[in-house]
């Protein structure tokens, strides 16, 4: 028998769920739909703009999604993590440009050689097509928007975490800070990015990307003279991006970074 309390609870839970969906949709709609085309290659991306103040420049965050959000709908890349940057509180406290590109099916943000299971990834000489397009897009955005080029940040989860390392090593003078989440990369090239303030996140129980990838990268960065931050969640598997991007200390740290 369903009592009145149960009915009220169900109604309340439905109301909360609907409110959350409406709130998420409202935040998603803040991101403009965009398409970057260069020499016949296309990169879909969404972009969030700060409230305009023509007297100042703003930081820019590049957000790289994971492999599950690949496609061409220009929507899936907003499912995980990036919406934390779009909250009213964060946008008010840290007004910035947020760029969320979408990687096409069967492509990657990174271009590595090696055996994934043995944690011996090696950076190839040329970037992947999606990464090349991101950098070309960024050049256009800097030309046409009030972007502070001393405060360009990059972050990503899983495949996007690997893409974050890839970008840092290929374009080490571009970024003011980086936040790779449950990612993997070429530890032999850690010295190239040792000067970039970096905060790494990983779940200790991650079955998809071995957390030892992060341990290895931290060790290599320290050996190269860096002082990376590291947060490991002891009871978390692959979904470490949920607590990582909800971390207000990380947000405060990220937006404080500026190239010297």
Q: Which ranges hold each PLM region?
A:
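Alpha-helical scaffolding within the catalytic cores
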Residues: 79-89, 182-191, 216
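Primarily recognizes the serine-hydrolase "nucleophile elbow" in alpha/beta-hydrolase
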Residues: 139-192
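Bacterial Sec-dependent N-terminal signal peptides
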Residues: 1-29
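Active-site machinery of serine-nucleophile hydrolases
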Residues: 69-131
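The conserved beta1-alpha1 loop
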Residues: 64-65, 202
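C-terminal catalytic histidine-bearing segment of alpha/beta-hydrolase fold enzymes
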Residues: 181, 188, 197-260
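Gly/Ser-rich "nucleophile elbow"/oxyanion-hole loop immediately N-terminal to the catalytic nucleophile
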Residues: 52-56, 111-157
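A domain-start/cap signature at the N-terminus of enzymes
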Residues: 24-60, 96, 130, 136, ...
